[in-house]
Amino acid sequence: MRDNTQHYRELFLDDIPLMDVRAPVEYHKGAFPNTVNRPLMNDIERQKVGTSYKQHGQQAAIALGHELVCGALKAERLAAWKAFAEANPNGYLYCFRGGLRSQIVQQWLKQDAGIDYPRVIGGYKALRNFLFETTRAAVDECDFVLVGGLTGCGKTEVIAALDNSLDLEGHANHRGSSFGRRATPQPAQIDFENRLAIDILKKRHRGVGQFVLEDEGRIVGSCSLPLELYQGMQSYPLVWLEDAFEQRVERILRDYVIDLRSEFERVVGVEEGFAAFSAYLQKSLAGIVKRLGGERYQRLAAILVQALEEQGRDGSVDTHRGWIEGLLKEYYDPMYAFQRQSKEDRVEFRGNQAEVIGYLRQRQALRPS
């Protein structure tokens, strides 16, 4: 039998499969990549056992748990655990603290299925704390540089081109602006933090000591950046990405109109997808009505409605450029210009996409190992 493990680092570096035996309500609040939920108890059973524990103590709670999970129900759950163990012979199981629930699953697997399957000592809480410390240590020990620039200048493309970048928007599944929602949901806050920490862990394991981030606010959609990282971002050096206005319009048209329509249609089907995509754009514009002002909003909203009608009718996207240009000139560019004033003393390089990528690669190469 393989031993129970406290080698949290190796679990994440090697993408070891994990079986989470917590209740679904716990799992959906936050888990880890390469994890599946095969609960010992469902949400209602867990609630009953928890109440029993508070009122009558541990032994009564354990007895109730065995009473609730027995017979055909126990056999069904045991079959799910057995299937996971056989499909993932290098995996581990865990509960919240690595205590009774994971030990009971281990015992039942051994007694009823003849399978010795190891658990993660300390469970979910220990794994979570390890990842929290991974992010904190990186902020303390590594160098960071931010990529800034006007809306649509291609910051995401720079992040994708570098092997020492951390894609905050990718981990959050959100583009970070009022129009940043994707066709699929954002992860839970804890899942976002865990994904980011594992990315940091793997890159540091490869020898990365200098990370490139996009200059973001504290909130990316519904996901909040780790506080210590966000605080550091208020003083990190900044590289400013520049691009022509026309190119920025075309990039936004591609990302937020052409590609995003396709994304919605892949997820929910062609007809419903276009309707959802149209509603998303109009809702996003309405979300900044107070900042735009009533007259400006009405004008841009009318252009957007016309653009969507034309796109739905014959696929034309030309009219979309009208509201995109208006938003850039009248809203986003002035806002970014104002924000940039407070960051000007941190800008160490300016250039187009190729120049910025080249500079950041050279910056990484020159960093002492």
From Swiss-Prot:
<dbReference type="GO" id="GO:0002098">
    <property type="term" value="P:tRNA wobble uridine modification"/>
</dbReference>
<dbReference type="InterPro" id="IPR027417">
    <property type="entry name" value="P-loop_NTPase"/>
</dbReference>
<comment type="subunit">
    <text>Monomer.</text>
</comment>
<dbReference type="GO" id="GO:0016765">
    <property type="term" value="F:transferase activity, transferring alkyl or aryl (other than methyl) groups"/>
</dbReference>
<dbReference type="InterPro" id="IPR017582">
    <property type="entry name" value="SelU"/>
</dbReference>
<dbReference type="InterPro" id="IPR036873">
    <property type="entry name" value="Rhodanese-like_dom_sf"/>
</dbReference>
<feature type="active site" description="S-selanylcysteine intermediate">
    <location>
        <position position="95"/>
    </location>
</feature>
<dbReference type="GO" id="GO:0043828">
    <property type="term" value="F:tRNA 2-selenouridine synthase activity"/>
</dbReference>
<keyword id="KW-0711">Selenium</keyword>
<feature type="domain" description="Rhodanese">
    <location>
        <begin position="12"/>
        <end position="136"/>
    </location>
</feature>
<keyword id="KW-0808">Transferase</keyword>
<protein>
    <recommendedName>
        <fullName>tRNA 2-selenouridine synthase</fullName>
        <ecNumber>2.9.1.3</ecNumber>
    </recommendedName>
</protein>
<comment type="function">
    <text>Involved in the post-transcriptional modification of the uridine at the wobble position (U34) of tRNA(Lys), tRNA(Glu) and tRNA(Gln). Catalyzes the conversion of 2-thiouridine (S2U-RNA) to 2-selenouridine (Se2U-RNA). Acts in a two-step process involving geranylation of 2-thiouridine (S2U) to S-geranyl-2-thiouridine (geS2U) and subsequent selenation of the latter derivative to 2-selenouridine (Se2U) in the tRNA chain.</text>
</comment>
<dbReference type="InterPro" id="IPR001763">
    <property type="entry name" value="Rhodanese-like_dom"/>
</dbReference>
<comment type="similarity">
    <text>Belongs to the SelU family.</text>
</comment>
